[in-house]
């Protein structure tokens, strides 16, 4: 049997072309668009086969000019409009692709009932050249995954925005030319589960409200040098929330899942003597106090330290079982205070960042009992930092208490 197959292959029989067309298209969909198009020269049978593939991945730099690019898109999109487009992924340079052609292209992709859409612009273009997404995109009934980078969005009436099947929404450096675009967009995605927003420094929005009954994962990351928009979160089913390098005057957590995991790196540009600032920080800490797992940055610990210095109290984190904290020397004394609010903690990872000599590390009796009775404690020191004798004492203390 094996010898027969080898002989048949060696005799030049084209067994691949004998496969059903839907299988061949499935094979081609696993290739890059470049390689898929190259198969058109194999034989007459393969000449137009790539046009039936419901996946397209392009870069405008692959084409000599805008006209050639448009001709290619025209041929692909117009070849068989009955075929649903599974995925369309384009990396374009606004300096090459004309604006009208871009709008036309996205419109046609939407008409082909696209499922996954990824649009990435050259990240180095100035704000004035960011291409605005066409209105048709905001009411695409077939879209499931939407990934946009370095484009712009106009403010639209809420009744004109409806994305009923979108489950994943990723916005990286998307400039929002309005004051309620994100909130409207998220609210229009009734089955949205995964939301990621990397802010744009030129946004007009001052307050962003994320309200969703379906979102399970939410990440927000700053690209601003100074102040980010204020945020409100109302996502009762949220299982994971990540806040990276964020800096704002307010971040309100109205609701998240009762046993969520959070990764918090946020700093508030406030005066701790201001009663409104103290109230806002209290509400933020209370909003995340029901989580089960937490990773917290030194910047956020600085906020907690400033808050504690004014009110001498912290909310109880009674559900918290796992904590990963990045500490610098000046915040070390806060650790026992914070952990004293975590009565059910059984896993503690302490990352030491540039600690110098300290005479003594004091831990509250409550923390001592917790460490000796539950879980484990792990110490991490950056590779570039040499452990001081005090750090070795701290590590020895943790080992002793967790043994």
Swiss-Prot record:
Domain F-box: 13-59
Top-level taxon: Eukaryota
Pfam family, one: LRR_At5g56370
SUPFAM superfamilies: F-box domain (SSF81383), L domain-like (SSF52058)
InterPro entries linked to this entry: F-box-like_dom_sf (IPR036047), F-box_AtFBL13-like (IPR053781), F-box_dom (IPR001810), FBL13/AtMIF1-like (IPR050232), LRR_dom_sf (IPR032675), LRR_FXL15/At3g58940/PEG3-like (IPR055411)
Name of the protein described by the UniProt record: F-box protein At1g60400
Species of the source: Arabidopsis thaliana
Phylogenetic placement of the source organism: Eukaryota, Viridiplantae, Streptophyta, Embryophyta, Tracheophyta
